[in-house]
Amino acid sequence: MYIHFPQFSPIIFSIFSIPIRWYGLMYFLAFIFALWRGKTRAEYYNLTQIEVENLLYSCFIGLFIGGRIGYIIFYNPVFFFENMSHILKIWEGGMSFHGGLLGVIIVLLFFSKKLNKHILEISDFIVPLVPFGLGAGRLGNFINGELWGRIAPDFKFSVLFPNSREIDLNVAANNLELKSLIEKFGVLPRHPSQIYEFVLEGLVLFFVLNYFSKKSMPFGFVSSIFLILYGCFRIFLEIFRQPDRQIGLFLNTFSMGQLLSMPMIVLGILIAINIYVKVL
């Protein structure tokens, strides 16, 4: 009835006693793809190969720093302020897309002045490269058996994630139906939300953005599509994703991911309106 999640080791192999993890591999592949794809599109955006390399290296630094700081501030400030030594332990998990986005925006502001280009012109170059990284990251989450979805006993394609047992025992404590499921399967069946995110944030967003990036559009248009679509996809997908237990839901309705995605949609719409007004 349900799909049993195959238990993968988070470590693929080791090189000179340095563990190579799935999540790290996904980030590495995302960077290699972005570097390759960015260089093939450089001429269209009047960028040199060196400018592309410097831009992408800087964006990845902004992504990591912003992603980590964003996670600390948005999702778990109390823990990290009480355990400062854990801030640099990125391998233990804890990155925020929205924090990473802010980090990249800061980098783009710097490069827009350095290259004497409008920030939206540079962001139009960057955003088609993003979905591959998003998709790779979600696959990494799935392989690690983390960031699973909400409990879904009535969905026949629900997945049994071994890592969810601790939370599942607490959830099922006062529910006979859920208790019986744990007795039978060990854990509760959940939506494989990482796969949903891989499809929408990775595949669909990749094809849409790369389709429009090949068209002759006013600069800022591709960026507005990215902001609107990602924001809408994230708000929708959070319905299936298990809320972060340390913060739960705001007003018993909205997750942190949904709240942070709302300004993205608003900003994307404002950019699109501005483009429309200028075209007229």
Curated annotation (Swiss-Prot):
Pathway: Protein modification; lipoprotein biosynthesis (diacylglyceryl transfer). Pfam families: LGT. It is found in: Cell membrane. Keywords: Cell membrane, Membrane, Transferase, Transmembrane, Transmembrane helix. It is an enzyme of class 2 (transferase). InterPro entries: Lgt (IPR001640). It comes from the Bacteria. The chain crosses the membrane at residues 15-35, 60-80, 90-110, 217-237, 257-277. GO terms for biological process: lipoprotein biosynthetic process. The keyword NAD does not apply. Its EC number is 2.5.1.145. A 1,2-diacyl-sn-glycero-3-phospho-(1'-sn-glycerol) binds at R138. GO terms for cellular component: plasma membrane. GO terms for molecular function: phosphatidylglycerol-prolipoprotein diacylglyceryl transferase activity. It is a multi-pass membrane protein. NCBIfam families: lgt. Catalyzes the transfer of the diacylglyceryl group from phosphatidylglycerol to the sulfhydryl group of the N-terminal cysteine of a prolipoprotein, the first step in the formation of mature lipoproteins. Belongs to the Lgt family. This is Phosphatidylglycerol--prolipoprotein diacylglyceryl transferase. It comes from Buchnera aphidicola subsp. Baizongia pistaciae (strain Bp).
